[in-house]
């Protein structure tokens, strides 16, 4: 069911995304050479490790000007275990009433997700620290 799965993908799409960005970068650079401009290429990228694993983080960070890492919506009304917590907490909250064990790796044992853990995961996957922009809720 493609509609219910968010953004369905096949195994080839991880590399295809990198190839798409590389082609866009090449075309933008060619146009920039012609009109003496630099055209920005950015990508909004996910926080969850299960989603990050579908991106070639190191190669993508070398292609784009920066990645807008979507470090928000960590908690919300969809949770059934109680009150919602921070939308975009900087560090893990040991008192989070709704730990998510499915997210326990590479995040702490209680499954709590945080901006610090997301950024550390991107760095571990080869992202350039200069290419990470964190997106926060407003």
Residues of each region from the PLM?
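Substrate-binding surface in catalytic domains of secreted glycosidases
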Residues: 2-138
